[in-house]
């Protein structure tokens, strides 16, 4: 993340450990699961099934059947899940492979007991794409009498994410945590590298820009200049090539 020999970057790496790929919460018979797209998912309940139940059915939303177990065999219905699901009749678990955002829904497992009564459990599944690697744009950088005015923007396409900016060893204050970092750096709070971490519930990615004191761009990763000099440089180079 930083050039070799910068010990402070080791501390920063510890702050940027990856997030878990699965987030689960339970409220009564409603289970919330958040998973990353492309992963394999197991929908199951935390309690044992009723003894000697007669029938077990998994639904996608409230009326579309995915699979039904009855008379010691499983019937898989025509749906977008066919070929991607497998039922374990012993536990009631439903295995789904390669989930996508289109699989977001409330899944219902309904069990018909031998008494004739029904019992059901609901699992609300949210599938999120992993966040892309952000690009840091240097909006402005200016040396101001031993201080450094810095304005950076952290850009990713069309995503609802959380932003966290880090200096060498610690995050910036909460009030600075958004897609744009605008701050004046003084000698006592100067950092060599500035990292933007974008994250959602299932993934995180980082982009980093590094400076040389007092206010000069050094090595960077995922950084982009908003530079007007390109407009001048490109025609100049073309002119030289044609002469």
From Swiss-Prot:
Tissue: Widely expressed on all hematopoietic cells.
GO cellular component: extracellular exosome; membrane; membrane raft; plasma membrane; side of membrane
Signals that turn on the gene: By IFN-alpha/beta and IFN-gamma both at the level of CD48 mRNA and cell surface expression.
Residue numbers covered by the propeptide annotation in the UniProt entry: 221-243
Keywords: Cell membrane, Disulfide bond, Glycoprotein, GPI-anchor, Immunoglobulin domain, Lipoprotein, Membrane, Repeat, Secreted, Signal
CDD domains, A to Z: IgV_CD2_like_N
Disulfide bonds: 154-196
Annotated SMART domains: IG
Gene Ontology molecular function, alphabetical: receptor ligand activity
Pfam families noted in UniProt: Ig_2, V-set
Subcellular compartments: Cell membrane; Membrane raft; Secreted
Ig-like C2-type domain residues: 29-127, 132-212
Covalently lipidated residues, kind GPI-anchor amidated serine: 220
InterPro entries associated with the record: CD2/SLAM_rcpt (IPR015631), Ig-like_dom (IPR007110), Ig-like_dom_sf (IPR036179), Ig-like_fold (IPR013783), Ig_sub (IPR003599), Ig_V-set (IPR013106)
Signal peptide positions (record): 1-26
GO biological process: one example: natural killer cell activation
Glycosylation: residue positions: 40, 44, 104, 162, 189
Record's bilayer topology term: Lipid-anchor; GPI-anchor
Free-text function comment from the UniProt entry: Glycosylphosphatidylinositol (GPI)-anchored cell surface glycoprotein that interacts via its N-terminal immunoglobulin domain with cell surface receptors including CD244/2B4 or CD2 to regulate immune cell function and activation. Participates in T-cell signaling transduction by associating with CD2 and efficiently bringing the Src family protein kinase LCK and LAT to the TCR/CD3 complex. In turn, promotes LCK phosphorylation and subsequent activation.
Subunit comment: Interacts with CD2. Interacts with CD244; this interaction is possible not only on different cells (trans interaction) but also on the same cell (cis interaction). Interacts with LCK.
Protein's UniProt name: CD48 antigen
Natural source organism: Homo sapiens
Originating gene: CD48
């Amino acid at each position: 993340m930083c050039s070799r020999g910068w010990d402070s970057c080791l501390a920063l790496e510890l702050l940027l450990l990856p997030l878990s790929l699965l987030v689960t919460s339970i409220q009564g018979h409603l289970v919330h699961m958040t998973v990353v797209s492309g992963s394999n998912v197991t929908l199951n309940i935390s309690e044992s099934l009723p003894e000697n139940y007669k029938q077990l059915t998994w639904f996608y939303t409230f009326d579309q059947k995915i699979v039904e177990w009855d008379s010691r065999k499983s019937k898989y219905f025509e749906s977008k899940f066919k070929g991607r699901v497998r039922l374990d009749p012993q536990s009631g678990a439903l295995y789904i492979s390669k989930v996508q955002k289109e699989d977001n829904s409330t899944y219902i497992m309904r069990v018909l007991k031998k008494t004739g009564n029904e019992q059901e459990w609901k699992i609300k599944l949210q599938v999120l794409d992993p966040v892309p690697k952000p690009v840091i744009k240097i909006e402005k950088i200016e040396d101001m009498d031993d201080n450094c005015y810095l304005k950076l923007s952290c850009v990713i396409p069309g995503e609802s994410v959380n932003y966290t900016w880090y200096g060498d060893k610690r995050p910036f204050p909460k009030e600075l945590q958004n897609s744009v970092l605008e701050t004046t750096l003084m000698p006592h709070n100067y950092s060599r590298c500035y990292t933007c971490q974008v994250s959602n519930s299932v993934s995180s990615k980082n982009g980093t820009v590094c400076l040389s004191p007092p206010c000069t761009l050094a090595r960077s990763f995922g950084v982009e200049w908003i530079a007007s000099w390109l407009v001048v440089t490109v025609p100049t180079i073309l002119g030289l090539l044609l002469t």
